[in-house]
Amino acid sequence: MYPAHLLVLLAVCVSLLGASDIPPQPLNLYQFSNMIQCANHGRRPTKHYMDYGCYCGKGGSGTPVDELDRCCKIHDDCYGEAEKSQNCAPYWTWYTWKCGSDGPQCDDSETGCQRSVCECDAIAAKCFAKAPYNDANWDIDTETRCQ
């Protein structure tokens, strides 16, 4: 999915939430984006991680191209495990967290699905912050490089 599609989807979802009687809640992808910014101290825009390597962005296959792409594969696998073990929908699960001096920290009151998804996102955000970013691995031809 292209970054523009994600933004349109986010705008539609936020509009629908605002039109309901339920107070709007942040979507998980919005929270994850904020966690990434917390972990990397705003050094790299979140959109740079949306179409990177074989696993950063929608889907994923093949062998990760580098350390950053491995972070995305680990995140994908973590979401998969949360879906199986917690029977939850990670992309739509809301949780409470804060940006601490050591990066994103999940609220201790979170349990179950919320805790699992929050931990997946926090671990990935910290991994992103540590991994080198290689411009050559952004927007690669996944058909040929991710088999």
Swiss-Prot record:
It catalyses: a 1,2-diacyl-sn-glycero-3-phosphocholine + H2O = a 1-acyl-sn-glycero-3-phosphocholine + a fatty acid + H(+). GO terms for molecular function: calcium ion binding; calcium-dependent phospholipase A2 activity; phospholipid binding; toxin activity. Binds 1 Ca(2+) ion. GO terms for biological process: arachidonate secretion; lipid catabolic process; phospholipid metabolic process. It is found in: Secreted. Its main location: secreted. SMART domains: PA2c (SM00085). Gene3D superfamilies: Phospholipase A2 domain. Its cofactor is Ca(2+). Disulfide bonds join 38-99, 54-146, 56-72, 71-127, 78-120, 88-113, 106-118. InterPro entries: PLipase_A2, PLipase_A2_Asp_AS, PLipase_A2_dom, PLipase_A2_dom_sf, PLipase_A2_His_AS. Belongs to the phospholipase A2 family. Group I subfamily. D49 sub-subfamily. This is Acidic phospholipase A2 S7-48J. It comes from Austrelaps superbus.
